């Protein structure tokens, strides 16, 4: 049975590190050629390509940037680190980051199920803003009561070395680790800008939660659930 609409949540990560020269960077657009540099991005890209081969199948693809909010663990690790007085960053080249709060992704999924113009198309999702590499950690620090924080910035080669060692050792031990070469590629990417105007036009998508409010809600949830 063919569904009336299939919404696939892909990722901005399918594009890898593109449009990183010159600075200021240009937003990644749907017309750009995907160049995934992680297993996660490659899997999403392969799924997108498969959907495009299915005949008479009404699909819509959503490509959110970094999704955060209640229950999300990667950004929780950052919050936990800041509570413990350490903020670790890598790379000295400017980094433009984008985010989307989880409820805005839900909004987009719902709208994609209804919008006829969206069938067989792919759309980026973010909150429509671009942030520097300190924005998220500074907001976390504020919501955690402004604890003193030691800001450490390491060169990319150091991150790559740590991720390579961690990934190799944990692979030998049969353990999963978030510090691997895929994580290196994600953290080292400098340009996470994306163009959400097509989503606004075709889906009627409009971000409701900007970063300051989203971080406030996230930290509140982490505290309520005993994560922080």
PLM features per residue range, with description:
Residues 111-178, 212, 216-217:
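Mid/C-terminal beta-alpha module of Rossmann-like enzyme folds, strongest
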Residues 27-33, 79-90, 146, 175-179, ...:
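A short C-terminal helix-loop "cap" of Rossmann-like NAD(P)-dependent dehydrogenase/epimerase domains
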């Amino acid at each position: 049975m063919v569904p009336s609409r299939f919404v696939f949540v892909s990722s901005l990560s399918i594009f890898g590190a593109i449009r990183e020269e010159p600075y200021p960077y240009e937003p990644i657009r749907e017309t750009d050629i995907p160049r995934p540099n992680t297993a996660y991005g490659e899997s999403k890209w392969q799924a997108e390509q498969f959907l495009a081969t299915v005949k008479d199948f009404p699909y819509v693809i959503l490509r959110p940037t970094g999704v955060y909010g209640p229950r999300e663990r990667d950004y929780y690790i950052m919050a936990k680190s800041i509570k413990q007085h350490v903020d670790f960053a890598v790379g000295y080249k400017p980094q433009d980051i984008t985010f989307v709060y989880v409820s805005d992704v839900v909004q987009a999924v719902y709208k994609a199920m209804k919008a006829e113009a969206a069938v067989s198309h792919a759309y980026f999702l973010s909150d429509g803003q671009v942030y520097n590499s300190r924005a998220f950690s500074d907001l976390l620090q504020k919501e955690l009561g402004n604890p003193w924080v030691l800001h450490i910035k390491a060169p990319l080669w150091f991150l790559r070395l740590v991720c390579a060692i961690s990934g190799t050792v944990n692979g030998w031990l049969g353990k999963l680790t978030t510090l691997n070469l895929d994580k290196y590629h994600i953290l080292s990417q400098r340009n996470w800008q994306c163009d959400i105007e097509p989503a606004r036009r075709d889906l009627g998508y409009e971000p409701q939660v900007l970063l300051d409010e989203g971080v406030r809600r996230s930290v509140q949830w982490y505290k309520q659930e005993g994560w922080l």
